């Protein structure tokens, strides 16, 4: 079968890969990089079937462009489909507000949802003599790996985490011939999660004890809920704002994808929700505010940031990746942010914590060795070659975006 990455092979972001053979063409994921303006993958040819691993924009953000055009089936978990719909609609909303290119229409999103064929972990379908199974990826609720089997089996990981988080269990390895695997954390390992949680909670209490406000900018999908679950046993006035509220409700609609539904339900009850703009005045008087956007570039976080930025007693606790050319990265590197076009110095405390939902360098290596593939194909990484010294017993393939290569499937 012929394979080609349309994006995301040698970079983190805008994922997309075609598989072509047996008279059919499959597209696995089709995302965008949510930069300013967004960056898109290479144009997709006509597609017969599309497989979506999960709902983050770098994996799902361009799916409506293909499905709106080709009316192809979209195989994914029902939870990923519903959250992806939120993300796609938000992408259009931002494009209109910022005068960016609109890569698809609202009608394309509607057609995409009509073309969804729900699958869940353990399900298997057959398309043109190729069996396709779905496995738990452990990244965020509803995230999946796909196993394609004909003469041999091929696993496509999407984004994975092999260690359990509060929100989801970890991914389990499975023997395979070909393993397409992400390499986001090609050059470092995460600190033990328990240590990170302990340090984070200690800082929260320290800031509140000195009379400050704790602002936790979070991604809507996964990180907001993970942090809410971590904070739920604290006896403080806590608020949650932004799209994370809607995502939490969707997660609770699909408890089968959660490690412990009761823990998330309990966390949701402990937080006050900002349901209308007027509630933000009350939220600003709270002690802990968990809000989108996770990189400080837009959303409700800007208003809260503006409120506390000159208060040395308060703190911004970053809990997610801060990409280049974002407010979050500028804050880390220069101690300032851009608000309403003006560069502002930030005087409150800043701390960063590693709550990644991706497997780290050593976890990826352990996963590969447990799968014991003949061929390892790295993707979703800008430093894939750093894995090579540890994988001399495997045939490692580092495809470039736009490069076609063949594998037995």
Predicted regions and their residues:
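Core dinuclear metal-dependent hydrolase active-site scaffold
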Residues: 1-45, 118-169, 281, 288, ...
């Amino acid at each position: 079968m012929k394979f080609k990455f349309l994006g995301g092979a040698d970079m983190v972001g805008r994922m997309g890969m075609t598989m072509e053979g047996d008279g059919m063409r499959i597209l696995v994921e089709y995302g965008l990089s949510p930069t300013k303006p967004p960056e898109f993958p290479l144009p997709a040819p006509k597609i017969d079937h599309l497989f979506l691993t999960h709902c983050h924009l770098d994996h799902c953000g361009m799916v409506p462009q293909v499905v709106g055009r080709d009316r192809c089936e979209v195989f994914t978990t029902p939870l990923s489909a519903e959250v992806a719909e939120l993300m796609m609609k938000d992408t259009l909303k931002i494009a209109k507000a910022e005068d960016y290119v609109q890569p698809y229409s609202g009608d394309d999103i509607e057609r995409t949802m009509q073309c969804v064929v729900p699958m869940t972990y353990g399900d298997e379908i057959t398309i043109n003599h190729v069996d396709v199974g779905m496995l738990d990826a452990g990244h965020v609720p509803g995230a999946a790996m796909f196993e394609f089997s004909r003469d041999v089996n091929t696993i496509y990981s999407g984004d994975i985490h092999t260690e359990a988080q509060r929100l989801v269990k970890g991914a389990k390895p499975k023997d395979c011939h070909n393993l397409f695997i992400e390499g986001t954390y090609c050059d470092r390992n995460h600190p033990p999660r328990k240590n990170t949680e302990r340090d984070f909670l200690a800082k929260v209490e320290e800031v509140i004890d000195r009379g400050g406000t704790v602002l936790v900018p979070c991604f809507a999908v996964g990180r907001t809920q993970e942090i809410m679950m971590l904070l739920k046993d604290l006896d403080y006035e806590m608020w949650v704002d932004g799209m994370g509220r809607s995502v939490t409700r969707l997660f609770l609609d699909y408890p089968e994808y959660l490690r412990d539904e009761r823990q998330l339900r309990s966390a949701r009850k402990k937080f006050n929700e900002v349901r209308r703009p007027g509630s933000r005045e009350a939220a600003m008087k709270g002690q802990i505010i968990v809000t989108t956007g996770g990189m400080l570039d837009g959303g409700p976080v800007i208003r809260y940031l503006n409120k506390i930025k000159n208060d040395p007693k308060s703190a911004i606790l970053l809990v997610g990746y801060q990409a280049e050319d974002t407010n979050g990265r500028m804050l880390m590197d220069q101690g300032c942010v851009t608000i309403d076009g003006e560069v502002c110095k930030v005087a409150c405390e800043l701390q960063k914590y590693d709550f990644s939902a991706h497997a780290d360098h050593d976890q990826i290596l352990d996963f590969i060795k447990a799968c014991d593939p003949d061929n390892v194909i790295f993707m979703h990484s800008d430093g894939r070659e750093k894995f090579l010294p540890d994988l001399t017993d495997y045939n490692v393939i580092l495809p470039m975006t736009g490069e076609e290569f063949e594998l037995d499937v």
